[in-house]
A protein has these predicted regions:
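Short conserved loop adjoining the S-adenosyl-L-methionine
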Residues: 149-154
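Class I SAM-dependent methyltransferase SAM/SAH-binding core
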Residues: 103-148
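A short SAM/SAH-binding and catalytic strip from SAM-dependent methyltransferases
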Residues: 159-171
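Conserved class I S-adenosyl-L-methionine
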Residues: 4-90, 94-102, 188-216
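Short alpha-helix
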Residues: 213-236
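A short glycine-rich, Lys/Arg-flanked "PGG" loop and its adjoining helix->strand segment in the class I
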Residues: 173-186
Length: 265
């Protein structure tokens, strides 16, 4: 049953006016700009965030719906772009490390949407996330690991794919450096929230009901960092809308980037 538009509007207004309701129903809410990376570190330390079982369950329910739609032949734009970025490498059945894999759903996305599939490994710093990933995909390789200290040798994977985790890493510079180190051929930074005309900032918000930290990156800084760590921009895609200008005062969007790794001479 579809409710009339006026009732839907009233319902949304009621939800947004109640902190308890909006945190239980809305995916992301209660944004606040933080003053520094140090404040962001403190905010992360004070909350279980992505480590909490309740947060993991809520995120998982949301992505199960996306996977179901994909299986019906209706993949959301970000899933299609992720597969397109892997395909744009030109590699056949590449080895792919996903950094910040959550409950592992991109292993299913790549199996379904990348011709020839990939040899997938996923890592996440949340033991709860990895436990759920192993439950869902018992034949796939998952490890508990930190994006800023990847437990792999240099050039271990054809592609390092950072799905939606770079936006939650305060030490994003280190995470980019580690991705470049472990990648043998390519790095993909997917659905990265960026400003085109403003500096990098840190936000605190509630995601799936839990307080987390988010980074909106200055696009020019992101590309400069990648170049600094031996990566060359090959292609970029506009991804799903994500404008937090109501909070920051500056328009933002999400983009996906394919970088090749420059060979040392």
């Amino acid at each position: 049953m579809k409710f009339p538009r006026i009732i839907r509007r009233i319902g949304k207004r009621i939800i947004k006016s109640s902190p308890i309701l909006r945190r239980h129903i809305m995916t992301s809410t209660d944004y606040r700009v933080l003053n520094s990376a140090e404040e962001a570190r403190g905010a992360m330390a004070s909350s279980a965030g992505w480590l909490a079982a309740r947060t993991v369950r809520r995120q998982e329910r949301a992505y199960r719906k996306l996977i179901t739609a994909m299986k019906r032949g209706e993949p959301r734009l970000d899933l299609k772009i992720a597969a397109e970025a892997i395909g744009a490498t030109g590699l056949t059945s590449p080895s792919v490390l996903e950094v910040g894999c959550g409950s592992g759903y991109y292993s299913e996305v790549f199996a379904a949407l990348v011709p020839g599939g990939v040899h997938y490994t996923g890592i996440d710093y949340s033991a709860t996330m990895i436990a759920r990933a192993r439950d869902h995909y018992p034949s796939t390789s998952f490890k508990i690991a930190d994006a800023t200290r990847l437990p792999f040798e240099d050039n271990s994977f054809d592609v390092v794919f950072n799905g939606v985790s770079l936006m939650h890493i305060v030490e994003y510079q280190v995470a980019i450096r580690e991705a470049a180190r472990v990648a043998a051929r390519y790095c993909v930074f997917h659905t990265v929230p960026v400003f085109r005309n403003y500096r990098t900032i840190f936000l605190r918000k509630h995601a799936y009901g839990a307080p987390v930290v988010e980074v909106i990156l200055d696009k020019s800084e992101l590309i400069s960092l990648c170049h600094q760590f031996g990566l060359r921009l090959e292609r970029e895609w506009a991804c799903i809308p994500y404008d937090v200008s109501e909070v920051t005062g500056y328009p933002s969007s999400t983009e996906t980037y394919l970088f090749s790794k420059l060979r040392k001479t």
